[in-house]
From Swiss-Prot:
Changing residue 27 to R: Abolishes localization to sites of DNA damage and interaction with ABRAXAS2; UIMC1; SHMT2; BABAM2 and BABAM1. This is Lys-63-specific deubiquitinase BRCC36. The lineage of its organism: Eukaryota, Metazoa, Chordata, Craniata, Vertebrata. Zn(2+) binds at residues 122, 124, 135. GO terms for molecular function: cysteine-type deubiquitinase activity; enzyme regulator activity; K63-linked deubiquitinase activity; metal ion binding; metal-dependent deubiquitinase activity; metallopeptidase activity; polyubiquitin modification-dependent protein binding. It comes from Homo sapiens.
Amino acid sequence: MAVQVVQAVQAVHLESDAFLVCLNHALSTEKEEVMGLCIGELNDDTRSDSKFAYTGTEMRTVAEKVDAVRIVHIHSVIILRRSDKRKDRVEISPEQLSAASTEAERLAELTGRPMRVVGWYHSHPHITVWPSHVDVRTQAMYQMMDQGFVGLIFSCFIEDKNTKTGRVLYTCFQSIQAQKSSESLHGPRDFWSSSQHISIEGQKEEERYERIEIPIHIVPHVTIGKVCLESAVELPKILCQEEQDAYRRIHSLTHLDSVTKIHNGSVFTKNLCSQMSAVSGPLLQWLEDRLEQNQQHLQELQQEKEELMQELSSLE
């Protein structure tokens, strides 16, 4: 028997430039999870016929009649600095949430749109895309403050056993009170596919939550927005700051001998060089290629302008 689930959010529209920043952030660290916050707005689109679940290439009509479809639009993301690196867990401090809210207010003034923190994202390196019971409980806590709050997970560094090629899976979910019985509707999404999935998490009876996947649609953009560009450029700085913080904490210990300190310094230098090779170098090359492309496009527009001006002068 199917369980009727009332969703606070029916779909998520993620801008392609924000998606690019999330993907680069997730692929920047293979051993620990990374995290960030999503900035956007929540729109209520009135529908008189059916509820639509949006996917990357199609639109499916659900037989349930609704009055309004609540869609979360994610325009940009904020990369968070990790104070504690863990392989299987990430945490967002109240100070980071407050700083993100301040940034959202600044963006609202610049764009004239009701920007706010609408969700969070984190990575799952080498593990499944589905949220853990800790992720589901954390998401439920955020939804107590905002029912429209969503969570995104990027599963990376996954190798297909048949083709031996890497894959990146992603999902968007919310938490709801667990039902006595539920059933899975679809499977995970591999890049541009979409699905809806429900499963009960093994928690205490009085605290049980289940995840429900929210259909997500990547909105294509020809250009990258200024805010997302700033976030992409900020990524190497944040990774460097995290390495410096970790090195300073270890270096401040008084019981370390000279050999250990030299070893720690070598590891710190090695990590910085690895980041330059894996993150900073490709990012710089991408920015240079983008600049060259923009300059070429500018020349084409200037040439087109001159041709139009000549045609206009000939008509006069």
